[in-house]
Amino acid sequence: MRKLLKPKREVGIVGYGAYVPMYRIKAEEIGRVWGVSSFPIEEKAVPGLDEDALTIGLEAARNALKRAGIDPKLIRAVWFGSESKPYAVKPTGTVIAEAIGATPDVSTADFEFACKAGTEALQTAIGFVGSEMADYAMAIGADTAQGRPGDHLEFTAGAGGAAFIVGPKSSETVAYFEGSYSYVTDTPDFWRRQHEHYPRHGNRFTGEPAYFHHIINAAKTLMEELGLTVNDFDYAVFHQPNVKFPLTVAKILGIPKEKVLPGLLSGTIGNTYSGATMVGVSAVLDIAKPGDRILWVSFGSGAGSDAFSVVVQDAIEEKRNLAPKVKDYVERKKYIDYALYAKARRKYIL
């Protein structure tokens, strides 16, 4: 049985865009409040009072459109992945599709799969375009992640997102997909039940057999199916709940950390959940050269991983400069204290 996922029509990335909120809180400031002195990251991004997963996704979508340079009416699908949607019952994708001018001849849906909801939407977009049902589809991953006050998730749960417009491979695509693979099991490592405000997790169980098992198996299977080795890749982007986990995966797979660091952003913006690998790949595309190959593996609790092999094309040289780069958002920051952070994130519910 062939495990590789590859459509009959070759598919690429026509445009990409990311967005990270301006506000930051240092892990040291959170630790000051809770009496903690060791931290998994340095600081994380915090959404403003007027920001949520929808607005983050919309900004990323607009940046992707700038790079794509296409009429938004040509986009026949807008699929949004998140675990922090502003509405429990109302699609977010319809709002974004309307705001970018893609309605009414468009399909929209909201995807959920913990931190890999965005790449799940991307897999669907690749199939949609690859089957020739449409020429363009947009996949978005964005989150404003929450952690219970005092829980170790509070140190890492950040905010950010990215959008990718998928189209037929051509001279206008900045990169193309060689193939993809999804690996899924029923592993209850992280969850939030209906009406609960904060998620729960299985502590060390979230590492193995959850994160490491799924990412490593997805990466290895993809490479085996494509006949590639780690030496064939110039960059690798893994889901990044912290800094340690993706670097550990790289070490296990035999990938030098120098190939991982350009797309590893969790140390300065936190874990952006559905946006994590999508923002990381956006950062890599901001600096990659034509011909570079990127290994891209997401992870979502519950649990599963999507793995992609992406090859950069000539169009990247011009298109990367048509919208703000990830570095621009990472360096644009304003620090807040825990009191403002708690207010902005509605940490205390009366």
Swiss-Prot record:
Family per similarity comment: Belongs to the thiolase-like superfamily. Archaeal HMG-CoA synthase family.
Keyword match Transferase: yes
Keyword tags: Acyltransferase, Isoprene biosynthesis, Transferase
GO biological process: one example: isopentenyl diphosphate biosynthetic process, mevalonate pathway
Free-text function comment from the UniProt entry: Catalyzes the condensation of acetyl-CoA with acetoacetyl-CoA to form 3-hydroxy-3-methylglutaryl-CoA (HMG-CoA). Functions in the mevalonate (MVA) pathway leading to isopentenyl diphosphate (IPP), a key precursor for the biosynthesis of isoprenoid compounds that are building blocks of archaeal membrane lipids.
InterPro entries documented for this protein: ACP_syn_III_C (IPR013747), HMG_CoA_Synthase (IPR004656), Thiolase-like (IPR016039)
Residues annotated for (3S)-3-hydroxy-3-methylglutaryl-CoA binding in this entry: 115, 156, 206, 239, 271, 301
Record-given protein name: Hydroxymethylglutaryl-CoA synthase
Species in which this protein is naturally found: Thermococcus gammatolerans (strain DSM 15229 / JCM 11827 / EJ3)
